[in-house]
Amino acid sequence: MPIKIPIELPAFQVLSDENIFVMNNERANTQDIRPLKIAILNLMPKKIVTENQLLRYLSNTPLQVEVSLIQTKSYTSHNTPPEHLNKFYSYFDDIKQEKFDGLIITGAPVEQMAFEEVTYWKELTEIMEWSKTHVFSTFYICWGAQAGLYYHYDIPKYDLDEKMFGVFSHWVNDEKADLTRGLDDVFYAPHSRHTEVKREDIEKVSNLEILSESEEAGVFIVATKDRRNVFVTGHMEYDRNTLMDEYIRDKEKGDEIALPKNYFRNDDINQKPLYTWRGPASIVFGNWLNYCVYQNTPFDLNTL
């Protein structure tokens, strides 16, 4: 089944051109099923890029998904056209009376700041608190995962000596876990962060399970036992060229940044980046939608 998004949203044409099944509202309304209501709190600077990335994976399942895009009121994006935000995004106040099957909270380039120093931290904590009663399962990405672990469980983040930047190998800790079902014994995923969470802090919380980790990148996928909260410390949604774009951006700013690891063939930036995480990303997003959301969310969201 397809993802349901407005036909004017840039992602509609992007995904259609990639032969991904998308559906506009008119066609979706003729189907006699209830779509999954998924909200995306998009904290990334280039919001249209992130929309395309996430919607690509949300559309790659047999489930019909209805997406609501959310922006913060306490901080206005400077990298996305205002007309796009006005047309396709809502503020939290606009949707807080609704209930959702799922919520995705993206990463944000603020991990070197203390959580409380982030401009929209208070608003984000209100959304995370609201999600306890209005969302069946929440999927936190990168800094969003660190923020969620800190808010819900007081798990701190730690500065890294150098940026975790590149594509790293990971393993699955529990082969029978629903969220990692279908992943190979070793799989790859991108990371792009200056901070980390530590296994020993997570292990102190009895309700949390570490489902996947990496020798080099550390803890990767963490989830509550009931799967109402899922935390992914990397960026499985990234496109082939995202790490390259970030590298070029940082070099142009004059930052000291090493080439992303395990990304360019022979570490040659003139070579096409190796796209080694598309399959694992599809599996993890699909498993979240199916096992963590669809199989358990109530048909009547008012009973949530």
Swiss-Prot record:
Pathway assigned to this chain's UniProt record: Amino-acid biosynthesis; L-methionine biosynthesis via de novo pathway; O-acetyl-L-homoserine from L-homoserine: step 1/1
PANTHER family: HOMOSERINE O-SUCCINYLTRANSFERASE (PTHR20919:SF0)
Catalytic function, reaction form: L-homoserine + acetyl-CoA = O-acetyl-L-homoserine + CoA
Gene: metAA
Enzyme active site: 142, 235, 237
Family named by the database record: Belongs to the MetA family.
Localization of this protein: Cytoplasm
EC number: 2.3.1.31
Residue numbers binding substrate: 163, 192, 249
Job of this protein: Transfers an acetyl group from acetyl-CoA to L-homoserine, forming acetyl-L-homoserine.
Highest classification ranks of the organism: Bacteria, Bacillati, Bacillota, Clostridia, Eubacteriales
Site feature: Important for substrate specificity: 192
Marked site positions, Important for acyl-CoA specificity: 111
Record GO terms (molecular function): homoserine O-acetyltransferase activity; homoserine O-succinyltransferase activity
Protein name: Homoserine O-acetyltransferase
One of the protein's GO biological processes: L-methionine biosynthetic process from homoserine via O-succinyl-L-homoserine and cystathionine
GO cellular component assignments: cytoplasm
Annotated keywords: Acyltransferase, Amino-acid biosynthesis, Cytoplasm, Methionine biosynthesis, Transferase
InterPro entries registered for this protein in UniProt: Class_I_gatase-like, HST_MetA, MetA_family
